[in-house]
Amino acid sequence: MALSAAEKAGIVAKYQKVAGDTGSPEVQVALLTANINKLQNHFVAHKADHHSRRGLIRMVNSRRKLLDYLKDKDAPRYSALIQDLGLRR
């Protein structure tokens, strides 16, 4: 279910502010979004996988907290990120 190293590196390269930036909210949200999308595809085939569903809900909550933090600290960055990732908010 996890992202491959190449997928992670591509996401980090796209959203990082400076080289080696893996901790900024944009990078963290983008990685969580990719993991969430991958897990959602998993649940199409495995409807009864409740253990993984718990992990999915945890990731969604973590992403929500990061997005709330970013919205409070820098609204234009928040708006650009959700538009780029295609999130509904």
Curated annotation (Swiss-Prot):
Gene3D superfamilies, per database record: 6.10.250.3130, S15/NS1, RNA-binding
Entry GO terms, CC: cytosolic small ribosomal subunit
Keyword Ribonucleoprotein: yes
Claim: Nucleus is one of the keywords in the record: no
Record-linked InterPro entries: Ribosomal_uS15 (IPR000589), Ribosomal_uS15_bac-type (IPR005290), uS15_NS1_RNA-bd_sf (IPR009068)
Superkingdom in the source lineage: Bacteria
GO biological process: translation
Record note on quaternary structure: Part of the 30S ribosomal subunit. Forms a bridge to the 50S subunit in the 70S ribosome, contacting the 23S rRNA.
Entry similarity comment: Belongs to the universal ribosomal protein uS15 family.
Matching NCBIfam families: S15_bact
Cited HAMAP family: Ribosomal_uS15_B
Chain's role: One of the primary rRNA binding proteins, it binds directly to 16S rRNA where it helps nucleate assembly of the platform of the 30S subunit by binding and bridging several RNA helices of the 16S rRNA. Forms an intersubunit bridge (bridge B4) with the 23S rRNA of the 50S subunit in the ribosome.
Protein name as it appears in the record: Small ribosomal subunit protein uS15
Lineage: Bacteria, Pseudomonadati, Pseudomonadota, Gammaproteobacteria, Cellvibrionales
Gene that this polypeptide is encoded by: rpsO
